[in-house]
């Protein structure tokens, strides 16, 4: 188990004298990249009309949590590694430890809400606007912080410097069994539920793809028999919909029920909110009743083109959200496994520090993912970097 150094706040050890400079360099990169990237993200959400949606408030919440860590906490981690000594006193060590876990907890809870939202969009589109209404989204955001604070406030007396990772954290011995239960809820139950939601999204699209394949086979059979008017597929019954979880390009997943453009553009697209999905169902029924020729003409309208384009945007946004979750999880897995398998700290101290330092990645990686995987964020970032304050006038 970790040994607490709450007398002299030292994490000095001969085995890490050289490694500390690696940790300091990495910590500076995280602090600078995370601060700049997360500030740019908040500004992008503020100035880009197509990013100003209710659902994107979840992205903003995740960004605030990351900014709290990178801007306020990370510089003290760098200083502690550089001197191998916590130099700001016992009280701020408690504040640091408390805010560290609050930030991580808010991130996990927000990732859960994002995954839930993506799932509702594809599986229960009528339920989405009820859950993520104006009041619902505000309540969800406030709840992430209230729950996080309430979870870790009781540990206030036992936040100390943990020498093996040179970081202020809770004393695992004095915190038992509460801390074990708490970590299990957040990191095991919480992150597992996010993974389950994305699996459900993928399965939903896969089932719809199978239905579409059967539909295509029936259409091919009708064409081979030269049935009049059978050469046109009935629009509105099926739409291509990418789950966003494939490693390559968009998958061939198909939605067996129309998806409205407003629904699929909650993270990218115009700023309109999700509308009642009964219109989509009515459109489907009309398309099934109308002759194929009449329906084919209707496809040329602007609204239909937009509806056909929007599912691919759903896939891109879902893929981006999944990548954020994946990076967060992968950055924590080595640290969590090491603490489970090496509870008595028999592994070299530098190994524990390496695992702990890898968790820093989750504070700065998200803006990089947004820029790489989302056109709207990429354009907003580029405008901010090129034009500075003038960007605020450009997007209004």
Curated annotation (Swiss-Prot):
Question: What parts of the sequence cross the membrane?
Answer: 27-47, 58-78, 95-115, 145-165, 181-201, 321-341, 353-373
Query: Topology: which residues are Cytoplasmic?
Result: 48-57, 116-144, 202-320, 374-396
Coiled-coil regions, chain positions:
none
Cross-referenced Gene3D superfamilies, in alphabetical order?
Rhodopsin 7-helix transmembrane proteins
**Can you summarize the PTM annotation of this record?**
Phosphorylated by a subset of GPR84-activating ligands. Constitutively phosphorylated at Ser-221 and Ser-224 in the absence of 2-HTP. By contrast, Thr-263 and Thr-264 are phosphorylated only following prior cell treatment with 2-HTP.
Which PROSITE patterns is this protein grouped with? Answer: G_PROTEIN_RECEP_F1_2 (PS50262)
What keywords would UniProt list here?
Cell membrane, G-protein coupled receptor, Glycoprotein, Membrane, Phosphoprotein, Receptor, Transducer, Transmembrane, Transmembrane helix
Signal peptide positions (record)? none
Q: Name the InterPro entries on file.
A: GPCR_Rhodpsn, GPCR_Rhodpsn_7TM
Q: Which GO terms describe its molecular function?
A: urotensin II receptor activity
In its UniProt record, which GO terms are filed under biological process? neuropeptide signaling pathway
Q: Which residues are glycosylated?
A: 3, 8
Localization per Swiss-Prot or TrEMBL: Cell membrane
Q: Does the keyword Transferase apply?
A: no
Q: Which GO terms describe its cellular component?
A: plasma membrane
Q: Could you list which ranges are Extracellular topological domains?
A: 1-26, 79-94, 166-180, 342-352
| Lipid bilayer topology | Multi-pass membrane protein
List residues modified as Phosphoserine: 221, 224
Chief location bin: membrane
Region annotation (Disordered) ranges: 243-310
As stated in the Swiss-Prot or TrEMBL entry, residues carrying the post-translational modification Phosphothreonine are 263-264
Q: What does this protein do?
A: G protein-coupled receptor that responds endogenously to dietary fatty acids or nutrient, specifically medium-chain free fatty acid (FFA) with carbon chain lengths of C9 to C14. Capric acid (C10:0), undecanoic acid (C11:0) and lauric acid (C12:0) are the most potent agonists. In immune cells, functions as a pro-inflammatory receptor via 6-OAU and promotes the expression of pro-inflammatory mediators such as TNFalpha, IL-6 and IL-12B as well as stimulating chemotactic responses through activation of signaling mediators AKT, ERK and NF-kappa-B.
Q: What is this protein called?
A: G-protein coupled receptor 84
Query: What lineage, starting at the top, does this entry show?
Result: Eukaryota, Metazoa, Chordata, Craniata, Vertebrata
Which gene is the coding source of this polypeptide chain? GPR84
């Amino acid at each position: 188990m970790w040994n607490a150094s709450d007398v002299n706040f030292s994490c000095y050890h001969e085995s890490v004298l050289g490694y500390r400079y690696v940790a300091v360099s990495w910590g500076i990169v995280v602090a600078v990249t995370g601060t700049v990237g997360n500030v740019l993200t908040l500004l992008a959400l503020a100035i880009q009309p197509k990013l100003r949606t209710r659902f994107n408030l979840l992205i903003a919440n995740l960004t605030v949590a990351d900014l709290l860590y990178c801007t306020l906490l990370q510089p003290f981690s760098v200083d502690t590694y550089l001197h191998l000594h916590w130099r700001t006193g016992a009280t701020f060590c408690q504040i640091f430890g408390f805010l560290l876990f609050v930030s991580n907890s808010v991130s996990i809870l927000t990732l859960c809400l994002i995954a839930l939202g993506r799932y509702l969009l594809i599986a229960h589109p009528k339920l989405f606007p009820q859950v993520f209404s104006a009041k619902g989204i505000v309540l969800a955001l406030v709840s992430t912080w209230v729950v996080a604070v309430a979870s870790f406030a009781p540990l206030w007396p036992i936040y100390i410097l943990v020498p093996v990772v040179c970081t202020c954290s809770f004393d695992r011995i004095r915190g038992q069994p509460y801390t074990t239960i708490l970590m299990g809820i957040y990191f095991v139950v919480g992150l597992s539920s996010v993974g389950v939601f994305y699996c459900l999204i993928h399965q939903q699209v896969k089932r719809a793809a199978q239905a579409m394949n059967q539909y295509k086979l029936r259409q091919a059979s009708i064409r081979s028999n030269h049935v009049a008017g059978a050469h046109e597929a009935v629009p509105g019954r099926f739409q291509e919909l990418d789950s966003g979880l494939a490693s390559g390009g968009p998958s061939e997943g198909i939605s067996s029920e129309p998806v409205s453009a407003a629904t699929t553009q909650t993270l990218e697209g115009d700023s309109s909110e999700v509308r009642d999905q009964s219109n989509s169902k009515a459109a489907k029924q009309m398309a099934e009743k109308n002759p194929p020729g009449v329906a084919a003409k209707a496809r040329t309208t602007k609204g239909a083109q937009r509806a056909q384009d929007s599912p691919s945007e759903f896939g891109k946004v879902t893929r981006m959200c999944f990548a954020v979750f994946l990076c967060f999880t992968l950055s924590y897995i080595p640290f969590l496994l090491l603490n489970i398998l090496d509870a008595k700290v028999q592994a070299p101290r530098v190994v524990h520090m390496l695992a702990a330092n890898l968790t820093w990645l989750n504070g700065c990686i998200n803006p990089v993912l947004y820029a790489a995987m989302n056109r709207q964020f990429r354009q907003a970032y580029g405008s901010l970097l090129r034009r500075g304050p003038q960007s605020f006038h450009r997007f209004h």
